[in-house]
Amino acid sequence: MSTREELEAKVAAATRLETSLRQQLDAMVEASRDDNADDEHDPEGSTIAFERQQLASVLERTRRSRSDAQHALDQLAAGTYGTCERCGRPIAPERLEARPDARLCIECARRG
């Protein structure tokens, strides 16, 4: 599978997951709206709030993953794929093989 195909597959998978997670989160919020329970005094309330927060966290990570893969596809189209966004040097092929959506070379990634 080519890098482009791999990135396109990652964008598609993340988009599907994002849609599913959004639906789950919306359903959870809607269900809690129908319930008049007070989370603070309901023994299940903190669990529901925790689950909602966990789901929102996974949704945000999925959005970032999709965005990173789309950014890499845009770089491919622009002819700048594989160039570190911080220092401008080439990103090692091994790093791109491990993380096709890498924006930074190893040295810049280590520096944070």
Task: Show which residues each predicted segment covers.
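Interaction interfaces in information-processing and related assembly proteins
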Residues: 1-78
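Short amphipathic alpha-helical surface micro-motifs
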Residues: 64, 87-88
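Short metal-coordination and nucleic-acid-contact micro-motifs, chiefly zinc-binding Cys/His arrays
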Residues: 77-80, 101
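Cys/His-enriched microdomains
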Residues: 82-85, 103
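Short, cysteine/histidine-rich loop/knuckle motifs that typically chelate Zn2+
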Residues: 86-87, 107
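Short functional micro-motifs and their immediate structural scaffolds
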Residues: 91-92, 110
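Short, non-ligating residues that shape and space the ligands of small metal-coordination modules
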Residues: 93-97
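Cysteine-rich micro-motifs
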Residues: 99-111
